[in-house]
Amino acid sequence: MSLVIPEKFQHILRVLNTNIDGRRKIAFAITAIKGVGRRYAHVVLRKADIDLTKRAGELTEDEVERVITIMQNPRQYKIPDWFLNRQKDVKDGKYSQVLANGLDNKLREDLERLKKIRAHRGLRHFWGLRVRGQHTKTTGRRGRTVGVSKKK
């Protein structure tokens, strides 16, 4: 970062209920938002026509609004379906990019649905066990250790 800080520099930006560090480069700063990774951030910034080397605090209000609208409506800006993190939603079959609090809500809804239909994955989540086929004989134990009593 240069030694001279611009007049309208924002050290912390509030975007989609997330605090973003204004001193970081914009491409990496917006990855602080849940549901936005480095690749998605680069694609969004290219579509918004924003310089990737710019600091997040140097953005104007107009540029921030552009980034937010592209992140929330990626299909309108011709970001391909395979790039999105919510494909063929179970309820409505739509493709979307779920961000911030919406991501937590969708994950919770998915787990509740799996538990409700008594799917194997849902039951494993309910019991607090490993879900993806890992062995559980020796690892993943919780609770107090049971000692061995000595013979007399």
Swiss-Prot record:
PANTHER family: 30S RIBOSOMAL PROTEIN S13/40S RIBOSOMAL PROTEIN S18 (PTHR10871), SMALL RIBOSOMAL SUBUNIT PROTEIN US13 (PTHR10871:SF42). It comes from Homo sapiens (Human). InterPro entries: Rbsml_uS13_C, Ribosomal_uS13, Ribosomal_uS13-like_H2TH, Ribosomal_uS13_CS. The keyword DNA-binding does not apply. One of its GO terms (cellular component) is ribosome. The keyword Cell wall biogenesis/degradation does not apply. It comes from the Eukaryota. Component of the small ribosomal subunit. It is found in: Cytoplasm. There is a cross-link at K91, K94, K106 (Glycyl lysine isopeptide (Lys-Gly) (interchain with G-Cter in SUMO2)). Keywords: Acetylation, Cytoplasm, Isopeptide bond, Ribonucleoprotein, Ribosomal protein, RNA-binding, rRNA-binding, Ubl conjugation. The modification N-acetylserine is found at S2. The lineage of its organism: Eukaryota, Metazoa, Chordata, Craniata, Vertebrata. The modification N6-acetyllysine is found at K94, K106. Component of the small ribosomal subunit. The ribosome is a large ribonucleoprotein complex responsible for the synthesis of proteins in the cell. Belongs to the universal ribosomal protein uS13 family. This is Small ribosomal subunit protein uS13. Its main location: cytoplasm. GO terms for biological process: cytoplasmic translation; translation. GO terms for molecular function: RNA binding; rRNA binding; structural constituent of ribosome.
